[in-house]
Amino acid sequence: MIEPTEGEVIVDGDNVMAMSIEELRDFRRHKASMVFQRFGLLPHRTVSQNVAYGLSIQGIGEGEATERSQRWIDRVGLAGFEQHFPAQLSGGMQQRVGLARALATDAEILLMDEAFSALDPLIRTDMQNILLDLQEELHKTIVFITHDLDEALRIGDEISILRDGEVIQQGDPQSIIMKPADDYISDFIKDINRGRVLEVRSIMEKADRASGPKMGIKTPLEDALQQLVNAGKDSGAVVGDNGKTIGKISMANAIAAMARPDRGDEGPRYK
């Protein structure tokens, strides 16, 4: 491993950088799991054995390890492939094995280093859906590294954008799109489909009452506009989880937010 030059990594009050080799080994076994870009499966082991590998490292008995691994094999949609070897699986299926292996250890932190980058677009979207569905239930801390901004905006609750090793902006997808920190970020996000990323909560006006179709706070602007068009209305009501009106949104504001900011003919404004 390459030793970091500076900084700290604090997990539950403990500085990972100050841990001994044995402490790091224990941290890796019990608190963190990883999903690799190139799958990292053991070619001579079956799907079931690969998924159970981390459990065996933790010292869990074969019977319990097999039972727990089977649960995650089922959850990622690989039931029936338990005795297959990695070479018999497609890339997407191999990555499902990798995800199941990481989840089987029940680690608090999941590190995913460009985990879906090697997959074709359709399978990549499918894996994103699987991850998001599982996260709805598991609520893990997931550190997802990607060069694909669309992927980051879709998956991330909090996003950090780096340039030359430095964090340029950190925030939720809505704030990054609505309030880019500098010219570099503005150029970085300029081709994003704002209508799919931005949600009504980012542009709504607070209101206790509003007319028109009702929509949830996380409704994408693209869908909100379609609802307004279908209803033949210029504005709609934004409702919270309890169904009560908390704001309103107008067609004009939605269209304005979806439009890419006009930069004219100037080129990048950063060095």
Where is each model-derived feature located?
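ABC ATPase NBD coupling module
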Residues: 16-33, 57, 62-63, 180
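Conserved signature/switch motifs of ABC ATPase nucleotide-binding domains
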Residues: 29, 84-87, 105
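Conserved ABC ATPase "signature" C-loop
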Residues: 165-166
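ABC ATPase "signature
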Residues: 170-171, 179, 248
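The conserved cystathionine-beta-synthase
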Residues: 211-241, 250-271
